[in-house]
Amino acid sequence: MPGNPLPDAEQLLKALTDQMRPEVGPETGLIGIHTGGAWIAERLHRDLKLKVPLGTLDVSFYRDDYEKIGLHRDVKTSSIPFEIEGRHLVLVDDVLYTGRTIRAAMNELFDYGRPASIRLAALVDRGGRELPVAARFVGATITLAANQNIELIRDSNGRLELVASKD
């Protein structure tokens, strides 16, 4: 996007880690939303030295708008290899936009049990909420037009990068 370069994803990840470190204990459950959120969660899990195994969610079947926005049911496996009942959780996503992905993720989480709390970490908050969802931990807040999209990609070396496109 000319005149509005996207922030460096690696720097945002470091900022996110620094925000989370004082508030996230080793017994906190960390769950990444496929695909970009899972990549971020992998790095956060390692850097925060969490003891609880990393969890991942694919919310494809829990979304209420997949037909409207053209989501393909390229389903990945959801895996939560720990008990969530009564546990403090951090749900991780790459880009927070309408809030619908987060709503879907919370619906799926409650199928696994009743956590003590759920906090949200997002690499980027781009505004545009349709549901009352807010992240506790945010790498950066940016403003994009409704016809602009932002996506997290990962190269073969594991380096993360934000890329923009238009509808």
Model-derived features: positions:
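PRPP-associated nucleotide enzymes
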Residues: 1-167
